[in-house]
Amino acid sequence: MYLTIEETAEYTNLSEDYIKSLVLEGKIRAVHDGEQFLIYKEQFKTHLEQLENYKALVQEILNEPIPEDIDVKDED
């Protein structure tokens, strides 16, 4: 399935200008039909999955309790 720049921006939650700049720089593969750029949707699947996995990992690390230090001495 192919998406326009506007649809791709909505799908990836990025701005249209940023998507267009990535297309023009060749960082996103796209087909130009003479009127608009068409971007293959599946090329983002792996990237978005990895991004979600990374977010979950960061959240897991942030939710992990800080262990008490066994070397702490009571100085009373």
From Swiss-Prot:
Lineage top rank: taxon: Bacteria
InterPro entries: HTH_17, SinI_DNA-bd, Tn1545/Tn916_Xis
Cysteine disulfide partners in this protein: none
Entry-linked Pfam families: HTH_17
Any one Gene Ontology molecular-function term assigned to this protein's record: DNA binding
NCBIfam families for the chain: excise
Protein name (record): Uncharacterized protein YoeD
Species classification: Bacteria, Bacillati, Bacillota, Bacilli, Bacillales
Gene (name only): yoeD
